[in-house]
Amino acid sequence: MKFINLVLCCFFFIIFFLSKPSLHASPPQPSINPRLFNAFIALQAWKHVITSDPRNFTKDWYGYNVCNYTGVYCAPAPDNPNITTVAGIDLNHANISGYLPEDLGLLTDLAVFHINSNRFLGTIPKSFSKLRVLYELDVSNNLLCGKFPSVVLSLPSLKFLDIRYNQLEGNVPSRLWDRKLDALFINNNNFQFAWPKNLGKSPVSALVMANIKVTGCIPSSIANMSKSLNEIILMNASLSGCLPQELGLLKNVRVFDVSFNNLVGELPETIGGMKKLEHINVAHNKLSGEIPASICSLPKLENFTYSYNYFCSEPNICLKLKDKDDKKNCIPHRPSQRSVNEYAYIDFDYVVLLRD
């Protein structure tokens, strides 16, 4: 009898043990849609290659509810409003160190990707080519390196591209200017390229190419951008030659900065046709001749900086501007001009200096 009781006891113990869930069993599948599950995989892979997060932006990046992650924004999918998906990532000014993994290509519904002012290394993954609805891409002020990220040329919905303040180098593909971008910022990199022949095809409103090397003269085809262009920043871009007369056709430009270059010749009088111009800076070039009165007569002009050139005359109307800088030129009877020992011959096309 004792033996039978022992057998029954062991039998029921085994049944009870087998009926309990194993501690080593696979976890149940999450009750989320496949797109959010892919987002979970992508974001966990990204978190795995983040080496420093001093402001704890990714501290709450755990669990399947990715819509509650800091910096992650969800919305109805563009192709199916009944499905929630990750539509945006904003980690601006987080000071995060790490890399961008290929797994980010799983975020196929991503429309906005902002990670400016961090310390991300490496390159933009080729898997970004899967982000067919990506509208804004801002990876500025990081430590990205290598050649121009050509993967951005394959993004059909991209309108805003900001890759400035990185360590990118080499040529900028001419195909970039065929893209229908609203804004383009490629400044403060190590790019070196010639002005593209198809520049005028670009519909950008902001053309910012400061602190890079662009060889040659500004092409006259820039006039073809007159409908969209309202800001031109070409400071310290290794520009040479003369400014084209066609600049006067840019009726919507408000800011024009070509300072710290090697431009020569006269300022085109046609700039007086840029009726919406508010700020113009041509300082630190080798421009000469007379300042056109048409520029100083612009109705919305607030600031005109033409210091450190070789202008020899300025009309009285320029003296009436509230905010102007004409120092270090060759203008008679004006203060803080160049000494006679700094120049010997000034022509409309070139300047010969006697001393540095």
Language-model regions, residue ranges each:
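Eukaryotic tandem repeat interaction scaffolds
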Residues: 192-287
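Surface-exposed cap/linker segments adjacent to membranes
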Residues: 2-76, 344-354
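The feature encodes a structural signal of leucine-rich repeats
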Residues: 100-105, 124-126, 145-150, 169-174, ...
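Leucine-rich repeat domain C-terminal region
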Residues: 274, 278-288, 293-354
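Leucine-rich repeat
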Residues: 83, 105-110, 129-134, 153-158, ...
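Right-handed parallel beta-helix
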Residues: 112-165
